[in-house]
Each structure stands twice: as C-alpha cells, then as structure tokens.
Amino acid sequence: KWGGALFAVGAWIKVWPAGLLLAALVALRARGAVLAAAVAVSMLVVATGIALGGASALLTPITEQTGRGLQVESPVSTVWLWAAAAGEWAASVYYDQGILTWQVVGDGSQLAADLMTPLLALVVLVIVSLGIVAARRGVDEVELLPVLSLALVMALITVNKVGSPQFATWIAVPVVLGLAWQAWGGPSFRVPAVLALVIAGLTQLVYPVLYGSLLALDPRMLVVLSARNLLYVVLLAWAVWHLIALCSRPRVVSSGVAAGAAAPASEGASS
C-alpha cells in the first residue's frame, strides 16, 4: 500500500515512477491495495491543484512532451548527430529557447519526433501485456516485478525523444530491486547491474564533463554517446527477453486448484 502511494507521488513529480507503479499493479498479488493508495494520492494532488487554481497545469508534463523535438541525448537523435557531423541531411544542433534545451534537427527529424510518443505508448502496451501474461501463468511476483519494472523503465528511456543525464539514475531503482530480490528466488541481476554502472560512467563523461565537445560534434564524444545509447537498447532487450522467458513457462496451478481437480479423479478411482 505504501509503495503504491510513494510511486504515485513520484509519478506526479517526475512521471517515470509511473512505470514502477504499473509494474506493481501487474505483478503484485496485493495490486488492489496498491491501486487504492495510488488513486487516493492522485485524488489529493488533483484536488489540491484545483483548489490552488492550477487545474490547467495538472497534465502539462504529458501535453508539453508531445510538442518537443529530438533532444540531443535521446537514443533516436544519435542518427542525426552523426549526420550533422558528416554534413548530411541538413542536420544541425540548436538551442531551443522555448524549453531551454539542446535539440537536433534535420531531414526527417520532425517525423521521427512525431512518431516517438505513439511508439513509446505501443512499446509500453506490449511490455505490460507480456507482464499480464506472465502473471496469469502464475509467475511469482519475486521473479516478475524486477524484470517488468526494468523493462518499463528502460522503455521510457530508450523509446523517448527526450534525453537527459538524469535518465541514467532511473535504472538504479529496478536494478537495486532485482539485486535485493535475488535472495528470495528472483532472477540474477548481475548483468543489468554491470550495464547500469557502465551507462552511468559514460553518462558522466557526456554531461557535465565533455558536454561542450558533444555539442561541437566531436567524433570521439559521438562515439561515447552512441555507446551509451546502445547500452540502453541492450538493457531494454535483456529485460524484454527475460520477460518473454517468464511468459513461456508452463502455467503454474495453485495447490488449491490442483487439490480440487484431483478430488473427483480419486473418487472415481475408488468407486
């Protein structure tokens, strides 16, 4: 219950914890309590916003997202950064005064920006569907929650036209959860932990250490950023692969259901 409340508070502050909340609603048996706590927090936030005259701003984190271009650090922007360095596709890096961030523009960049939000929604829907299948097949929440949380968080990072150094810190939550739950029979999270550390190191190089070189399209920094973004994709693929593996397991039948099914068979044998 308290986890649902905390995830809801986090989602209203920074959006991405909504992925953790969604994973909890799918994977945990106590999803009713999680949902009730999240709804209670959300109602309190909405009521407070309306009371303070900020009703029109409640959904700005989502509505403002749709109008953005391709931010420099997002994985999808990598192609246009290399094109800008090569003098192709009329690509260039510019500073958007409206939202105070560096973005990339070039042939096809606006189409890519327009497609990223619906693509992100589709990827999240697919991941949640896999999680529901795994839960219905009786996969234990100790195994399902860390993998599903990581998959959703990595989708929010990887399939996103927005990029930021803080995104690398998001990975810590599902990775720490996975490492902690290994002791209770959860899957090994050594690979995600190592990848997360490498991603953090590369991100530190990108920003703030050598960000000026990146904006100047220094090929060495483009290699660093490309490697970091590729590792985002690898980590997403790892999580989805393990999620599919959980879905592929034979269905687990609870002991109560199994006992109920066995009773008629034993009665028939005795008669």
PLM feature spans:
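Juxtamembrane membrane-water interface segments that cap and precede transmembrane helices
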Residues: 88-111
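Short helix-capping/linker segments at secondary-structure and domain boundaries
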Residues: 87-89, 182-183
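Multi-pass membrane glycosyltransferase architecture that uses lipid-linked
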Residues: 1-63, 112-271
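Extracytoplasmic catalytic/substrate-binding loops of multi-pass membrane glycan-assembly enzymes
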Residues: 70-76
